A protein has these predicted regions:
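Active-site region of the double-stranded beta-helix
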Residues: 17-122, 142-147, 152-187
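Weak global preference for isoleucine
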Residues: 7, 36, 128-131, 140
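N-terminal capping/interface segment
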Residues: 1-14
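Charged, surface-exposed interaction regions in soluble eukaryotic proteins
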Residues: 121-125, 129
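Histidine-centered metal-chelating micro-motifs
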Residues: 108, 128-129, 133-138, 158
Length: 187
């Protein structure tokens, strides 16, 4: 029997960056987040090409039992008084759960169950977050540095952005002096 040795992909746990030949990367700009922020005038006043967050992930086979691993890097910033955030989503297969691991920065994970119940969890280096099935999720950067979170989720989960329309998430997070405050947008 011939034994082979390989160097697997690496992740820097201080910043969430992957080292591998086939890392997939995607950047989401402010211009692609139309309708996400509460203040459309403030949103339009900022450069459309401004990168709000980047996702890098390792490729994986998309079939039952397989997992993706990736990192979201959410930039610090605001649109008006509202902190930068990811688009957020339910899973296309809503019974699929996910884990987030805080790596750097300070922020929040907004969880909204399909029944409308919301929870905000503080994200920081070392924090561990279970995103239950049937739960939409969004990262919010309340700090002054990049917020990075490593995620592990089933390759069959998919993303369902339309399930939150037309109202979006129930909660929004705004700056409140040096802190933050959450405001309900609807009942």
């Amino acid at each position: 029997m011939k034994l082979t040795s390989m160097i697997p992909p690496q992740v820097n746990l201080a910043n969430g960056c992957f080292t591998a030949p086939d890392v997939q990367r995607k950047s989401t700009t402010l211009g692609s987040l139309a309708g996400i922020f509460a203040d459309p005038v403030a949103w339009q006043s900022l450069p459309a090409e401004l990168a709000v967050y980047q996702v890098e992930m390792l490729p994986s086979v998309q079939q039952e039992g397989e997992l993706f691993v990736g990192t979201t890097h959410l930039q610090p910033g605001r649109v008006g008084d509202e902190f930068f955030m990811t688009r957020g989503h339910f899973h296309q297969r809503p019974e699929q759960a996910e884990f987030y691991f805080g790596l750097r920065g300070q922020g929040l994970l907004l969880l909204q169950h399909q029944d409308g119940a919301c929870t905000l969890e503080q994200v920081s280096p070392g924090s561990v977050h279970h995103i239950p099935s049937f739960t939409a999720h969004r990262l919010i950067n309340t700090g002054n540095d990049v917020l990075s979170a490593l995620a592990v989720w089933p390759t069959v989960a998919g993303h369902n952005y339309d399930a939150l329309q037309p109202q979006g998430f129930k909660l929004r997070v705004f700056a409140d002096g040096d802190d933050w405050k959450a405001e309900a947008q609807y009942e």
